[in-house]
Amino acid sequence: MQSNQENSKKGQYNLNKLQKRLRRNVGEAIADFNMIEEGDRIMVCLSGGKDSYTMLEILRNLQQSAPISFSLVAVNLDQKQPGFPAHILPEYLEQQGVEYKIVDEDTYSIVKEKIPEGKTTCSLCSRLRRGILYRTASELGCTKIALGHHRDDILQTLFLNMFYGGKMKGMPPKLMSDDGQHIVIRPLAYCREKDIERFAIARQYPIIPCNLCGSQPNLQRQVIGDMLRDWDKRYPGRIETMFTAMQNVVPSHLADADLFDFKQIRHGSEVIDGGDLAFDRETLPLQPSAWQPEEDEATPARLDVVQIR
């Protein structure tokens, strides 16, 4: 009995620490990129996955203590995928007392009609979904659209573009939408996926599976994700350091002539960003600069995904 109580106290203690870290990460991202301003109405895109549930809860939590006033409205797009449990999100949101809107649009049929059997449908589905969400944001009078992408998503996108697209391009924490009418924010930009997963497990969110459409998985993204997870296990701190590198770009030491004017470097030019250090072996720390020891964790749990029958 006493052992169960101790485990319960330890579990609650770890959950509180985890929530504080997620709050801090989200708060720092909001401040660094000026994501939320006085009077904003934020459309929180809710898919039923661990990331969007966590984003909604942390934003609601911050809303109570923020020095500015802003409102939230959760939006889910029901794309009429076979077996989609349409009751899950309304029941959860009503229980939580969250303002919400469910948008019903049968994009599934459109995608199935346009994309040959066996081919990935993600690209077309994403474009259709994006347009509907932009329209919905306008209808609801929202000034910002919040998406649940986290730090691992951003790094995966960076490596996908480097390996397959020949670009140094990631996923920005804040951007202007394709139509130039909406500001899109990613409040979880500083959050680790493993923290989000642990938080979602502890909160017992009613997770909706993401493969209801039957689409083929994005194998390239899957390979990159596996690579990053392997690095995270074998080289603790590497992921943190790579993300820090994305925030410390030195254009003069890359090779993009559009980003830096190399042609103007001549005899007598000033030394820029330390000059040429190519022949000097820089002293690097034994541990990655952003490395932090892991906190004590109980036996790894698993997300309780809603069973679709």
UniProtKB/Swiss-Prot annotation:
Sequence motif PP-loop motif, residues: 47-52
Bound cofactor: record note: Binds 1 [4Fe-4S] cluster per subunit. The cluster is chelated by three Cys residues, the fourth Fe has a free coordination site that may bind a sulfur atom transferred from the persulfide of IscS.
One annotated GO molecular function: tRNA binding
Entry cofactors: Mg(2+); [4Fe-4S] cluster
Uppermost EC category: transferase
GO biological process: tRNA thio-modification
HAMAP family: TtcA
Name this protein carries in UniProt: tRNA-cytidine(32) 2-sulfurtransferase
